[in-house]
Amino acid sequence: MAIHVVNEARRCLHCKKPMCREGCPISTNIPEAIELFRTGHKEEAGEMLYENNPLSVICSLVCDHEKQCEGHCVLGRKGAPVHFSSIENYISDAYLDHLEPEMDPKKGQRVAIIGSGPAGITISVLLARRGYDVTIFESREKIGGVLRYGIPEFRLPKSILDRYQKQLIKLGIKIRPNTAIGRTLTVDDLQRDGYEAIFIGTGVWKPKAMGIPGESLGHVNYAIDYLVDPDVYDLGDNLVVIGAGNSAMDVARTALRKGVRHVSVFCRRYQTAASVREVDYAKADGVEFYYGMRPTRITDDGVYYKKVEMDEEGNITSTSEEQFFPCSSVIIAISQGAQNRIVSTTTGLEMSSHGLLATD
């Protein structure tokens, strides 16, 4: 690993106009981080990455690098881009356990963070360092949100999140696990108890339904529910995954690791929403892909569907008669939305047309 990242760092051209940085959603100064690492200043590189993004080590594993930093690297136009994800992971993983960030004086003001997913963790770190008294309210047993309960271990080791929890506590952040705001406690209760600001970052845990017959049958499940704890599901030997995003890839690859013999992914179109890398990994694991598949109903024995043909612009040119695909179980992975528990129990909050918290 060390030799690999050193060699990758040496490949960086240090462009005057670094396209890799432009491709990063948070404008990470990639050339500077690489140069610090290459010249033996790994600690400074780790500090720089952490200051720009407290979740640097996590992003090094789960970001869509091929569309962002690495996808914009000029070396990728004629060959392989600099694999900054590997460099970032090597630097940030080493830095995480012994970081000593500067802290502002205590302000004596309470802030509540509802949800400990990526947004909740990040804003908790930023506010705690600015002197606020931060409390995280997490509905599940451990922090992480979708990072822990929606991404498989083989993509993001849970031990990294356990290390983050230690760092949060080290910063003076209080964590209340197994506390879902909107049940026993509400946002109104938090305001009553002196929290001067409340950040709601509860994620999108409500699966999107397909609205087809058979969706409520006992062998049909949703991706976001399955990924929370795959070990409690008995999927049989033949699984159909409906959907073609990264979550669908996570489901398919996890199911194979849990003993399912055959996994088939149904894609509505002739390309996938998942990253090329994740699709390649899924194919390498043995997942089979079927394109132009439009499920019409689910039965105890499998999925009925219509096969569509499309032109280059994505317009449907023909639709087949209904056909049958046998399987022992189905997992639907087409999207998720936000739950309305907090909005429905809080005075003055409203939902947007997209099912999210309405803001100014």
Spans of features found by a protein language model:
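Beta1-alpha1 glycine-rich phosphate/pyrophosphate-binding loop at the start
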Residues: S27-T39, M48-Y50, H72, R77-V82, ...
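Short hydrophobic/charged patches on amphipathic alpha-helices used for structural packing
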Residues: A9, V187-Q191, D231
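FAD-site-proximal beta/loop scaffold in flavoenzymes
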Residues: S216-G236, S318, P326-D360
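Short acidic loop-to-helix transition motifs that present clustered carboxylates
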Residues: A180-L185, D225-D229, Q271-T272
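Glycine/Thr-rich phosphate-binding loops of Rossmann-like dinucleotide-binding domains
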Residues: P207-M210, P230, A273, E313, ...
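Feature captures the FAD/FMN-dependent oxidoreductase FAD-binding
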Residues: P105, R110-I114, D162-I212, T296-Y304, ...
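Glycine/serine-rich phosphate-binding loop and adjoining beta1-alpha1 elements at the start
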Residues: E22, I26-E102, I169, P177, ...
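A short, basic/flexible loop-to-alpha-helix module at the beginning of a structural domain
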Residues: D93-V111, A223-D237
